[in-house]
Amino acid sequence: MQNLAPRINKTHTAIGPRPQHSVARAIAGSMLLSATLIVAATAEEYPNRPVRFVVAFAPGGITDIIARLVGERLSERLGQTIVIDNKGGAAGALGAKLVSTSEPDGYTFLVTTTAIAVNAAASPISIDPRTQLVPVAMAASSPTIIAARTPATSKSLPEFVRNLKQDVLTYASSGAGTVEHLTAAYLLKGISGIAATHVPYRSGAEAINAVIGNHVNLSSTPVGSAISVVQNHQLQILGVASHKRVAMLPDVPTFGESGLADMD
């Protein structure tokens, strides 16, 4: 974006209301809690009208939840309405494309994930985030997990595959080319004797519902998207893509502990 001015874009959820702080500081202070990137531009006289967050995934997933939490806090700090606009599709590429072609006036932000880096190399509608967007803040990290519908007697991903007793396994993610898709594809490729078919959805929430509804065998999703259904005993996590176990899930092994690739 040519001029350094703040940016935000339309769901149609409005988050309604402080003063002329640096928008970069305001967002960074509110965003230390996610695995999501807020990509935007930065302005001088700001804001004098509602700001728009374009969320690159469908409602209900971890990216959407983070956008709403950040939007609420940012609205309080800036004294202006934040409008949440979910533009899911093409693993986040549609939302990124929309923001990249919007006015660089400081009123349109993209809320996305690390999928934006994969899209730049693989998606036919991708943009170059290095030249077409200005990064504002990284929120936090939510490692990828692979989970099965309960009750599942298996305690790890290799054990689940061995007990499946079928030649083809299906797994869901929030879209083709997302980190969750590529993580699961890589891990399942390392387990012999099974063919894995990817079923893409528009958000982590939809991918989780697919496995709960028994439409697919597994779901690959950020741990933040799955924690509530795990606590409700609807989902069992078979492994986490991290060098060490997640504090809130101390009994869930890392994939490295299960004999698969050690990743973070």
Residue ranges and their predicted role:
Residues 111-116, 204, 221-226, 241-243:
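Beta->alpha turn/N-cap motifs
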Residues 141, 226-264:
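C-terminal lobe and pocket-closing loops
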Residues 26-37:
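Bacterial N-terminal signal peptides
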Residues 49-58, 82-83, 108-111, 134, ...:
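Short, well-ordered beta-strand elements
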Residues 53-66, 90, 172-179:
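Extracytoplasmic "Venus flytrap"
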Residues 87-95, 141-142, 198-209, 222-225:
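Short helix-initiation/N-cap motifs at beta->coil->alpha
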Residues 80, 102-110, 167-169, 212-220, ...:
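Alpha-to-beta junction loops
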Residues 101-107, 120-206, 255-260:
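Hinge/capping helix and adjacent helix->loop/strand transition within the periplasmic-binding protein
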